[in-house]
Amino acid sequence: MLIDGHGRTVDYLRVSVTERCNFRCQYCMPEKPFSWVPKENLLSFEELFLFMKVAMDEGVNKIRITGGEPLLREDLDSFIKMIHDYKPDIDLALTTNAYLLPQTAQKLKDAGLKRLNISLDSLKPEVAHQIAQKDVLGQVLKGIDKALEVGLGVKINMVPLKGINDNEILDVMEYCMDRNIKIRFIEYMENRHALEALKGMHGKEILSKVKEKYTIHALGREGASPSFNYTIEENGYEFGLIDPHKHDFCESCNRIRLTAEGFLIPCLYFDEALSIAEAVKKGDIEEASQVLATVLKDKPKENRWIEGELEEGQEVSSRAFYETGG
């Protein structure tokens, strides 16, 4: 069992397999040029898996594959099969923008993937184009349909932005409602890589939009999930809200993150990280385990953000979320 320095059990590992992405979303990497970390700097699937076996043997029972856009990494289904074959009962999920799902969903399902989290910020082609800086909506919707068709579990993530897609909160939720998909609204996470002019919506503002049409009741958090859940009285539909400016989900945080280059990150909102790359490249499991132990010991008690409006002196993450699957 993995225990951090504050007594929390860590049983969830998020693994980024690439920083590359085929979108240029305004809240993530709008001005990132199409230049990338050289392939030789990335850990191979075998090297990533070497560390992941250590984590699974020590009690990790949930793994999420992220990016960038993980479906851009060649032979991803083979990597997923490696994980599934080693521990068939592991909760194995993937976060994606769904653009490549029409041609990959079946292979992912066959390899052992169980669930997907998919970003869907708009149902209007022109707004989706504005956010992603690419004509994406038609292909994304096809990807969602294909995932459902092959039997993958699907959740939708939406980041409401003032003046851009804030008038679509109900539309996107009802799209999910019609398909029996859970949606989680995510407060925009300030970071130095995003478009400076962006303004996100506070959780209370998001809920007020839902309340314009529906009566909602708070359900609370489910386990260690950062999502606070609500139910709609009129039809029993359940949705979630992820509000990272609060600290109330930090007390039950159960996750660590591994980047494609081998950096082990204790918290998404901290810049500190230690590398396991040298250890796994030489097959030194003991050294990799020692790095893991240090990261767990130093895992922070809570994030550095503050609830409410961003104020002078408040932390703005310099972490590139496309490197860590933010």
From Swiss-Prot:
UniProt entry keywords in alphabetical sequence: 4Fe-4S, GTP-binding, Iron, Iron-sulfur, Lyase, Metal-binding, Molybdenum cofactor biosynthesis, Nucleotide-binding, S-adenosyl-L-methionine
Cofactor: binding details: Binds 2 [4Fe-4S] clusters. Binds 1 [4Fe-4S] cluster coordinated with 3 cysteines and an exchangeable S-adenosyl-L-methionine and 1 [4Fe-4S] cluster coordinated with 3 cysteines and the GTP-derived substrate.
Family: Belongs to the radical SAM superfamily. MoaA family.
EC number: 4.1.99.22
PANTHER family recorded: MOLYBDENUM COFACTOR BIOSYNTHESIS PROTEIN 1, MOLYBDOPTERIN COFACTOR SYNTHESIS PROTEIN A
Cofactor: [4Fe-4S] cluster
Gene this protein is translated from: moaA
Quaternary organization: Monomer and homodimer.
Name of the protein: GTP 3',8-cyclase
Chain sites annotated for binding S-adenosyl-L-methionine: Y27, G68, S119, M189
Binding site for [4Fe-4S] cluster 1: C21, C25, C28
Domain of life of the source: Bacteria
Role noted for this protein: Catalyzes the cyclization of GTP to (8S)-3',8-cyclo-7,8-dihydroguanosine 5'-triphosphate.
Radical SAM core domain boundaries: 5-227
